[in-house]
Amino acid sequence: MPTSNEMIRNARERFNKAIEDKDAATIRMLLAPTYHIVTGRSDQNHGAGEEAARWAGVFQSDPTAIYIRTTREITINEAWGLAEELGNWQGSYTLAGKLVNASGVYSAKWQRARNGDWVLQTEVFTTIEFDEGCVPPEPI
């Protein structure tokens, strides 16, 4: 039986592979129903269905879009079925006809589901490096 750490790392790899394969259905399966994201540009989405639809839109509008999340560390509360993942992300996409790159750090909260799988509750991405032409978030 895999450890919780291995299960979370495997789920992250499935998420990366789903992005590579443009597979929004698999992404949805990895998310808690009340999933919440704050993107690297500070956009926010709530709910597994909304997030899967957002990915489907990205895949349809920009076939060059690719994002990879690389886990640095995972801290697990086995008794409560909670975990925090910290890592680095990198992405590239087409903007105004030009391929641009961005990268940064992320934090993810995982929760063990009733069936024993680990699903993402929330992810927060912070952009640290970016190519000229990347669009920053609007000020709050």
Q: Which residue stretches match the model-derived regions?
A:
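Class I (Rossmann-like) S-adenosyl-L-methionine-dependent methyltransferase catalytic domain
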Residues: 137-140
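Residue-level signal for short segments within beta-strands and strand-turn junctions
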Residues: 39, 93, 111-112
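Short beta-strand segments enriched in hydrophobic/aromatic residues
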Residues: 31, 89-91, 124-127
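Short helix-adjacent coil turns
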Residues: 15, 22-23
